[in-house]
């Protein structure tokens, strides 16, 4: 498959936004953070420590899918940071898209807990991490990256192992 974009997935605190932003910068592609697309109601629930239900997520996933489709249709290349914890969520994200590669940032509960408990100013509370691990359905066919690696190393490996259309990399920055 020729890669036209990426979805970088995993539980909260695994480094999705950091890796996706760095990857987008390296490739000259469009960084999208799924957190920026949550409704105020969803953010309020998460701030209160209430895990989102599938029905809470449905409009958010539809909006993300529309954004992926419109970005690709405009000839751009999206790099989306999104939890995408369940297979059904990933199916909705990938609907009517072509060439998106799924990257799964995998790490232990203890490592991610240590990261998320140090994070300041994020609406996702550390106490909700357990619910994310419980909801997580590990993906099949994703490029799995060990989050013990530094973000730059993860991005280097993604770029090295992905099959790009050379014209999509015309603005790639040197490493």
Indicate where each model-derived feature is located.
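Small-molecule kinase domains that catalyze NTP-dependent phosphoryl transfer to phosphate-bearing small molecules
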Residues: 118-157
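Conserved lysine of the Walker
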Residues: 16
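Loop/turn-to-beta-strand initiation segments
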Residues: 74-78, 101
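P-loop (Walker A) phosphate-binding loop of NTP-binding proteins
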Residues: 11
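Conserved phosphate-donor/acceptor-positioning beta-strand/loop module used by diverse small-molecule
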Residues: 96-115
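Hydrophobic anchor at the beta1->P-loop junction of P-loop NTPases
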Residues: 8
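Conserved substrate/cofactor phosphate-moiety recognition/catalytic segment
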Residues: 21-66
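Walker A (P-loop) ATP-phosphate-binding motif of ABC ATPase nucleotide-binding domains
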Residues: 5
């Amino acid at each position: 498959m020729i890669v036209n974009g990426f979805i970088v997935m995993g539980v909260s605190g695994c480094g999705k936004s950091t890796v996706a932003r760095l990857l987008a910068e390296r490739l000259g592609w469009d960084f999208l953070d799924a957190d920026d697309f949550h409704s105020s109601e969803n953010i309020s629930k998460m701030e209160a420590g209430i895990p989102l239900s599938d029905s809470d997520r449905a409009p958010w996933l539809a909006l993300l899918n529309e954004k992926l489709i419109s970005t690709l249709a405009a000839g751009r290349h999206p790099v989306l940071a999104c939890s995408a914890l369940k297979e059904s969520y990933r199916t909705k994200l990938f609907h009517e898209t072509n060439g998106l590669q799924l990257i799964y940032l995998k790490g232990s509960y203890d490592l991610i807990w240590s990261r998320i408990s140090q994070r300041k100013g994020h609406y996702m509370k550390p106490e909700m991490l357990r619910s994310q691990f419980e909801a997580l359905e590990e993906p099949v066919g994703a490029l799995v990256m060990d989050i013990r690696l530094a973000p730059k190393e993860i991005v280097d490996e993604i770029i090295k192992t992905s099959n790009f259309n050379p014209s999509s990399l015309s603005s790639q920055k040197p490493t």
